[in-house]
Curated annotation (Swiss-Prot):
Species the sequence originates in: Halothermothrix orenii (strain H 168 / OCM 544 / DSM 9562)
An example molecular function term from Gene Ontology annotations: protein folding chaperone
Entry annotated with the keyword Zinc: no
Cellular component, GO, one term: cytoplasm
Name the UniProt record assigns to this protein: Trigger factor
HAMAP family per record: Trigger_factor_Tig
Amino acid sequence: MEVKKEQLEGNKVELKVEIEPERVDKALEQAYRKVVKNVSIPGFRKGKVPRRVLEARYGKEVLHRDAFDILVPPAYQEAVQAAEIEPIDRPEITDFYIEENKPATFSAVVEVKPEVELGEYKGLGIEKDEVEVTEEDIEAQLKSLQEQHSQLKSTDKEVVEEGDFVVIDFVGTIDGEEFQGGSAEEYNLEVGSGTFIPGFEEQLVGKKVGEETEVEVTFPEDYQAEDLAGKDAVFKVDIKEIKVKETPELDDEFAKEASEFDTLEELKDDIKERLTSQKEDRARRKLEDEIVDRVTENAEVDVPETLVNNELDMMYQNLAYSISSYGMKVEDYLKSMGLDEESWREENREEAEKRAKSNLVLEAIGKKEGIEVTDEEIDNKIEEIAKDGEQKPEQIKAYLQLQGQLEGLKHTIFVRKVIDFLVEHNQND
């Protein structure tokens, strides 16, 4: 097979490909065997029409479409490798010519990754934040744990005060009509928590258990439900009970109840260790981000619109997946923010351009420094994934191969190695 490469304007390349006659004849024969299965001609059984008769009746072109599908996709991939290019979009295939006993030819125009002009990417002397876990940090974690193990207890209190937990039934109306989400029974509300519409909780202070009261509020103009925003509402509220929160003492008994440790000091040590690890991770990520930002800024590259759109697609898919975990559709979420997909993409275009440029720069650095990913590193990563998911590595690898995601995993490992390289050569000791 012969391949000629021509650089076009921008980041486009044209490949002119010539496929050897033997391969062409084999493809035409395969195409014939496929087409003839559905052909009926008087004098021949269905599927048994000779090729010369088939071509005489319908023309030789009857086999060309299937021969194209057999020949061109693999030939294009071989041409890409031979030309040593990295396409970033689907090719435009033109000028396909095929005839028996002759070479087949076609042209493919495709957008490729642009050249990256690297700037300084070593010796930048970037500082990593110092990590310190204070007593206040530990106390905050203990307080959070304490809150989680607190319980609401019934009380004989009659009058609602700030900080009380009240059990209420309520029904809300707007212009005398009930509205969706405006009523509930046996609802636990912490007075003063700001959970409800502004003004609602304050009007409960001083009210008595068993008392039915009316609460008048106005929904904020920026309220999430647009049909309620800015409207006046009246809630009929039945105060059924006042509860108080019982918070456990911070002692060894609490440590035993709330953790796997026997003493409060052991629990504190564990909290300190976990907080230190979390802060170290954050400091490392911040350092990595600063280094990647700097080396990206120092590089020159024209980022193709195709890569920006690909990045936006990925960001949008991630957003949709994240929102779905809350039982929402991404369209509804964007609508609540006053956006649609088009306006969201416009708002995030600058970030997508930045990410696309960073990816190109990291790949260029990795290539220049000869950074490669070994089969052993891929297997180790698969074992790590399998361990986290309590599955067998063989199952994970088979799934990745089936989904065509093995190359994606390899690229993820590659990028991680490049970032580790950059940290090693840019962090101040």
